[in-house]
From Swiss-Prot:
Record region (Disordered): 41-72
Protein's gene: hrpA
Subcellular location: Secreted; Fimbrium
Gene Ontology cellular-component annotations: extracellular region; pilus
Biased composition (Polar residues): 41-56
Protein name stated in the entry: Hrp pili protein HrpA
Keywords recorded for this protein, A-Z: Fimbrium, Secreted, Virulence
Function: Major structural protein of the hrp pilus, which is a component of the type III secretion system (T3SS, Hrp secretion system) required for effector protein delivery, parasitism, and pathogenicity. The hrp pilus functions as a conduit for protein delivery into the host cell. Also, affects the expression of T3SS-associated genes. Required for full expression of genes that encode regulatory, secretion, and effector proteins of the T3SS. HrpA-mediated gene regulation apparently is through effect on the mRNA level of hrpR and hrpS.
Length: 108
C-alpha cells in the first residue's frame, strides 16, 4: 500500500465519520421536531382535561345505546324466528287441508 492510498483511505474514514455524526445529529433534531409537532397538535393538557369528562359521558351513553340495540336485535331475531315457525305451520296446515280435499273427491 502506498502513501497516497493510505491518505485516501484515512480521508474517507474522516469523511465517513463526519457524515455519520451529521446524520446522527439530523436524526435527533428530526425526532425532537416531530415530538414538538405532536405536542403542539394535540393541544394543551387543559383542553384535554376539559373535554375528558364529556368524552367519558359520551362513551357511557354509547355503551348504553349499544346494550339497548343488542337487546332490540335479539327481540327482532326472536320475532322473525316465531313468524317463520307460524308461516311453516300455516303451510303445513294448508298441505293437510289440500290432502284431505284430494282424498275426499270422488273419482268418476
Amino acid at each position: 500500500m502506498n502513501i497516497m492510498s493510505s491518505l485516501t483511505n484515512a480521508g474517507r474514514g474522516v469523511v465517513n465519520t463526519v457524515g455519520g455524526a451529521a446524520q446522527g445529529i439530523n436524526s435527533v433534531k428530526s425526532s425532537a421536531d416531530r415530538n414538538i409537532a405532536l405536542t403542539k397538535n394535540t393541544g394543551s393538557t387543559d383542553s384535554i382535561d376539559a373535554t375528558r369528562s364529556s368524552i367519558s359521558k359520551g362513551d357511557a351513553k354509547s355503551a348504553e345505546l349499544d346494550g339497548t340495540a343488542n337487546e332490540e336485535n335479539g327481540l327482532l331475531r326472536e320475532t322473525s324466528m316465531l313468524a317463520g315457525f307460524e308461516d311453516k305451520k300455516e303451510a303445513l296446515s294448508n298441505q293437510i287441508v289440500a290432502s284431505k280435499i284430494r282424498n275426499s273427491v270422488v273419482q268418476f
